[in-house]
């Protein structure tokens, strides 16, 4: 699996046509996932309950797609175990993120939640056993500098936000585990099958947590929840899951940084949250990084 991923990245991401479509799918998946925070804010249920409905509404469609994809064949026991483990990581990630975002500033939650990007980049370097050089190194620098500009202005360190900050950080760590497990299981499972199994595991965990926290479960307005299931779970996670085995954790980590940039734009459009010149420049830096990471690169120096 690792050898396959490394060879793809070294050859500019795969055969040209497949590589382009796979990278576009990875970006489109992250853009769809970016809308999730906006829709969670619009939902009239509790935060964990909205995550439950995201899964529950999407699940019948995911299972139908998985059945069609697999022809009704039962996956291997090992694949089911790995996909189920990914589902546990993802459910706990959603719980930590949705609760944490209510106990800290949005900028803090976004900053700490996106530690998954840094962790995936570090893991990608560890797997390759080589330091990034050339365009790849510049892309990493631009991506994280741009994200710091996007989130740094509104970030605030305070004891009042400690619990929320720690929960958001935990969410980022859990999401890293989810991505790596899904990337692993995609070596043996098709995308909808892997996503369907992980989603089945998520549903009872999220419902049980929402009930334990005494959240409002039943919505009055279904529109935000239906859109959340469509954009974040079916489209966003569907595209992400399909593209995962085609790229290294390093590339996947960098594309995750699209999410805070798009979230800032969505906040401006939906809630009138101001975007200053620094925010715009930070978004442009992230965009430039995504272009550079696809350019041919010199062979990196061994670690």
Predicted region positions:
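Loop-to-transmembrane alpha-helix entry segments
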Residues: 77, 81, 110-113, 129-149, ...
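Transmembrane alpha-helical segments that form core, pore/gating elements
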Residues: 38-39, 62, 120-126, 140, ...
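Loop-to-transmembrane-helix transition segments
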Residues: 21-31, 53, 72-96, 138-141, ...
